């Protein structure tokens, strides 16, 4: 006899949709508290199973990964945006693309990116005046777009920066889980969907313009875009410009926003915890002095590393991930039907008191070698895990640390909001602009 996971029955037909729309984060927390590590419910007509224990997560992402694909839920939601890019592609095509792109994120290549990251950060900070109030999350989104454009695609995004940032923001807002329209098909002409469609058209225009401009260059850099174009132009492959477009969209939308959020949440957490901030600043002074940070400096900055890790634990930019079972499966003592959508929330696991003492407090000092060795493998997974872990993990961590270090060398950040609140969009977005007053050090 099949034993389904426990969970809320919700309303007739609607199931748990309304409670999830009202407050996804509290809903996740309530499910874990009331029903445990494996919870089944109905959302928007789909069987959803929340899995929130590291042991089960490891089975899904690693041991039994062949039985859990990206699935129809993610493809319905994101297929328009990233097509067959790395985020959604499966099987041999995914494997070939992953192998093709992975060298662009090897350590040797990252070393070349580091100087550009610091240069772009200094250029952005040059626009800030001591004593002024800035919208930190917006500033950092513009910065990470500029960094990504220069390092991976070899172009200066200055002219299209605002358009790109607004487009990315509109697309992310389309997937705010707190809006009923998110669960409607994209072709239904709601105001949000119309804005989304315009943003998608803008995104395609910008991407194809970048491709055309690169092909017209006589002397182009050896970067990710060059690798992609060479693969498309190779007669031995079946790749097309649409494939190229999908991978560029995946990298841009998947990479710049999560990095900007990690930076935002690190800087605001430090601003609200003066003792932790003082420790990081003292470390930067001792190791760097007045020099710019380099990639070779990062191993000598453990307090900076801990500050970033703790911010990504407390406020994980990727707050959940999804999989779909492609056959009936057993998770723990429960049966999961074929076609169930699994939601694996970092939001719940990263705040679990079984793994993290005082889980809702920012405590970077917790990240000792002994503590990390004691953690279950998937108690902390800000970059997903298994063979489909984020391809840009090293790039994103290096970028976040270099940017945070560079900015702390120049400014103090006075957080202007009483506290942070969040919106569940494609990523963990601040519910309102993050205003900070910057003062030169």
Task: Please place each PLM-identified region on the residue numbering.
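Short, small-residue alpha-helix embedded
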Residues: 258-271, 403
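N-terminal membrane-proximal hinge/A-helix region immediately C-terminal to the signal-anchor transmembrane segment
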Residues: 1-96, 111-124, 143, 155-159, ...
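Conserved cytochrome P450 K-helix/beta-meander segment immediately N-terminal to the heme-binding cysteine loop
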Residues: 66, 322, 344-371
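Cytochrome P450 I-helix active-site segment
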Residues: 5-10, 114, 118, 219-226, ...
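Cytochrome P450 heme-binding "Cys pocket" and the immediately downstream C-terminal segment
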Residues: 274-276, 373-375, 393-429
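Cytochrome P450 heme-thiolate monooxygenase catalytic core
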Residues: 70-75, 93-94, 109-261
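Conserved cytochrome P450 K-helix E-x-x-R motif and the immediately C-terminal K′/meander segment
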Residues: 17-36, 291-332
């Amino acid at each position: 006899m099949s034993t389904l996971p426990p969970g809320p029955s919700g309303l007739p037909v609607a199931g748990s949709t309304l409670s999830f729309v009202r407050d996804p984060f509290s809903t996740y927390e309530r499910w874990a508290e009331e029903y445990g590590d494996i919870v089944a419910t109905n959302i928007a007509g789909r069987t959803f199973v929340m899995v929130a224990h590291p042991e089960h997560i490891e089975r899904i992402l690693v041991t039994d990964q062949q039985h859990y694909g990206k699935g129809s839920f993610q493809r319905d939601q994101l297929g328009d945006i990233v097509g067959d890019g790395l985020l959604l592609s499966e099987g041999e095509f995914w494997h070939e693309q992953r192998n093709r792109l992975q060298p662009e994120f090897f350590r040797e290549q990252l070393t070349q990116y580091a100087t550009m990251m610091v240069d772009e950060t200094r250029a952005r900070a040059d626009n800030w005046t001591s004593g002024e109030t800035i919208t930190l999350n917006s500033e950092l989104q513009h910065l990470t777009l500029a960094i990504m454009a220069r390092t991976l695609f070899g172009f200066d995004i200055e002219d299209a920066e605002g358009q790109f940032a607004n487009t990315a923001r509109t697309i992310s807002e389309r997937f705010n889980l707190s809006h009923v329209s998110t669960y409607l098909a994209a072709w239904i002409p709601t105001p949000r969907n119309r804005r989304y469609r315009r943003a998608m058209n803008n995104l395609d225009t910008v991407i194809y313009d970048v491709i055309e401009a690169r092909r017209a260059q006589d002397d182009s850099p050896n970067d990710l875009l060059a690798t992609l174009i060479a693969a498309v132009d190779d007669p031995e492959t079946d790749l097309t410009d649409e494939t190229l477009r999908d991978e560029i969209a995946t990298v841009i939308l998947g990479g710049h926003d999560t990095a900007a959020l990690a930076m935002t949440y690190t800087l605001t957490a430090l601003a609200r915890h003066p003792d932790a901030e003082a420790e990081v600043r003292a470390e930067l002074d001792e190791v760097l002095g007045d020099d710019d940070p380099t990639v070779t400096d990062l191993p000598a900055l453990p307090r900076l590393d801990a500050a970033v890790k703790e911010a990504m634990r407390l406020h994980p930019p990727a707050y959940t991930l999804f999989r779909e079972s492609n056959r009936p499966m057993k998770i723990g003592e429960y049966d999961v039907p074929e076609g169930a959508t699994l939601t694996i929330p970092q939001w719940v696991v990263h705040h679990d008191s079984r793994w993290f003492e005082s889980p809702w407090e920012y405590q970077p000092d917790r990240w000792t070698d002994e503590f990390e060795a004691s953690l279950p493998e998937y108690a902390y997974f800000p970059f997903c895990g298994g063979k489909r872990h984020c391809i840009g993990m090293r790039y994103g961590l290096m970028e976040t640390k270099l940017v945070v270090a560079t900015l702390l060398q120049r400014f103090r950040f006075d957080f202007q909001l009483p506290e942070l609140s969040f919106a569940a969009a494609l990523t963990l977005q601040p519910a309102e602009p993050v205003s900070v007053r910057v003062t030169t050090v």
